[in-house]
Amino acid sequence: MANTKSALKRVQISERNRLRNKAYKSAVRTLIKKCLVAVSAYGANPSPEGLESAQQALSEAYSKIDKAVKRNVLHRNNGARKKAGLAKALQKVSQAS
């Protein structure tokens, strides 16, 4: 356990930040999954509404990823890789349709 007041405070701060980061990462993963579900639904049944739904989900995921990168929850390259993967999935389905 921490021996000094400052060390104790750092333990408390790091725990607070860990929980905050965990919530952010969870939200990012949830939106990525929703985006991939929307993309696969569009791939199974191509329609203008499906494409719009997939693009909306992609936009929401991009926004959350960018905010996580801005708050240093995700590394810049990790965020870019996640966004590129989502864009690639939508592009692949769009070209097949």
UniProtKB/Swiss-Prot annotation:
The biased composition feature labelled Basic residues covers 76-85
A single Gene Ontology CC term: cytosol
Q: What top-level branch of life does the organism fall under?
A: Bacteria
Q: Which UniProt keywords apply?
A: Ribonucleoprotein, Ribosomal protein, RNA-binding, rRNA-binding
Annotated stretches, region: Disordered? 76-97
Keyword rRNA processing on this protein?
no
Q: List, as start-end ranges, the regions of compositional bias called Low complexity.
A: 86-97
Listed Pfam families: Ribosomal_S20p
Instruction: Name the GO terms of the biological process aspect.
Output: translation
> In Gene Ontology terms, what is one molecular function of this protein?
structural constituent of ribosome
Name the family the entry cites: Belongs to the bacterial ribosomal protein bS20 family.
Role description: Binds directly to 16S ribosomal RNA.
HAMAP family (UniProt xref): Ribosomal_bS20
- Name of the featured protein: Small ribosomal subunit protein bS20
The species this protein belongs to is Microcystis aeruginosa (strain NIES-843 / IAM M-2473)
What gene name is listed for this protein? Answer: rpsT
